[in-house]
């Protein structure tokens, strides 16, 4: 039972595209026993879906809209904390494989609670101790990774520019699968 998490920064002018890509990704990956947790964030944090079976996690236009500044670190920190609290209630053998997909437009960071250093430490800990697979996609992701103290815990990253975000996720997952088989 795998869990797919999407932390997705609001992208002005690309709302319809994001909704279509998200729903297509779910449809293409909907075979299997997967649960989806979807987090939308900007200057607010919206836990849209929590552990919802993949077939019921579609995104609709009234759910996805642009508001204010992006609090990327706060959204990632809250998502990790929320999922850890859920996993702590499960026996270790029952904890699902977790994939964290973070989409960001590379814009401002209005976070108030978490710092960049705190987030990189949390991400590395989740990957090292809990086996999470963590993927970044967005604008200027490589620059963000280069600025990190370490990014050993990141399983994939790619700048998207105008590429299909979820197509990039599929490629990252495929590369990850192939590297594990070698």
Name each model feature, range by range:
Residues 1-182:
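Acidic, low-complexity intrinsically disordered regions
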